[in-house]
């Protein structure tokens, strides 16, 4: 099946599983107490008939494969209640103070949340996943989505580094909102907050 590739969705789901259902957080166990199998490219390719066949009813040409929701199909392979726990402990995305939902990259350790700096105004602490046991690594981005700072301690960034970063960003992006106190400022996904 050359047109049907597994790596993208498999890698993303596998990374989320690895980050959460490791010994550090929650063991990956079936409800009956037996260990759950891992999902790998090889195992999925070897068992295509078992898990893919039920979804092929409306596929009549190769281009239809692109419309299949591999993430949902792979999540359905997990024993209950692992899919629900996975969404609780390792969400695909987090809501930030601006109201945006930002995808989490689980291919890195710790997982990375790349977000524009202005969208975090008003947030005092680094967002956490895995039931509060794991801080995400924040890649703070400029309005042009270029990295300006990497931190796992947002409180320290606001207290110690923000003023310096603000000077640089204010010079490069003068039309954007750069408050003196980011903890009481209104978060925004725009150049300036709405009035």
Language-model segments: what does each one mean?
Residues 106-107, 125-126, 147-153:
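Short conserved micro-motifs at the rims of enzyme active sites and ligand-binding pockets
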Residues 107-136, 140:
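Short, surface-exposed, low-complexity cationic segments
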């Amino acid at each position: 099946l050359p047109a049907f590739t597994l790596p993208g969705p498999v890698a993303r789901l596998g990374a989320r599983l690895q980050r959460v259902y490791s010994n550090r957080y929650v063991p990956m166990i079936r409800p009956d107490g037996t260990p759950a199998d891992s999902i790998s490219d090889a195992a999925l390719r070897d068992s295509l008939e078992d898990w893919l066949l039920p979804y092929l009813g409306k596929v009549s040409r190769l281009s239809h494969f692109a419309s299949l929701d591999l993430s949902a199909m792979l999540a359905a392979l997990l024993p209950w209640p692992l899919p629900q726990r996975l969404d609780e402990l390792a969400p695909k995305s987090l809501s930030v103070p601006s109201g945006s939902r930002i995808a989490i990259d689980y291919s890195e350790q710790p997982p990375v949340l790349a977000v524009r700096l202005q969208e975090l105004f008003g947030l005092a602490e680094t967002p956490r996943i895995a039931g509060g046991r794991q801080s995400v690594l924040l890649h703070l981005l400029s309005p042009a989505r270029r990295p300006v700072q990497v931190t796992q301690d947002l409180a320290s960034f606001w207290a110690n580094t923000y003023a310096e970063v603000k000077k640089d960003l204010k010079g490069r992006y003068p039309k954007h909102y750069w408050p003196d106190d980011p903890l009481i400022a209104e978060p925004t996904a725009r150049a300036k907050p709405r009035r």
